[in-house]
Amino acid sequence: MTMTDNPIAKPETKPHALIASDRVEGTVVRRPNGEKVGAIERLMIDKLSGKVAYAVLSFGGFLRLGEKHLPIPWERLKYDPAVGAYSIDITDDELAQAPSFAADKEFDWGDRSQETHLHDYYKARPYWGM
């Protein structure tokens, strides 16, 4: 008997690949060794394609003083269901030198040269060329 034959039958529960954006915000980002890098502050979504272009990580600071935001191309993050966190392979030096902006400022998302710099830094394909 299929679900169409029995309207009260429940579908099998399987893990799914979709998640609401507000559930991604606040998710921890770790290195492969488990060390915390930061947390996802927000996602930047391409309005035309609907694809996630960047995860903006909040990093450092205490009580938001000195906190930086790091826009990271989405393709550089990998989700690890075992720990419920995203992972990025990045060293302390790479993190310190990564393009960032102060938490009380805003990145100029309209400046394609800044986005190109981000993609070059992370050796990631530009989302607009996918």
Task: Give the location of each predicted region.
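Peripheral interaction segments used for macromolecular assembly
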Residues: M1-M130
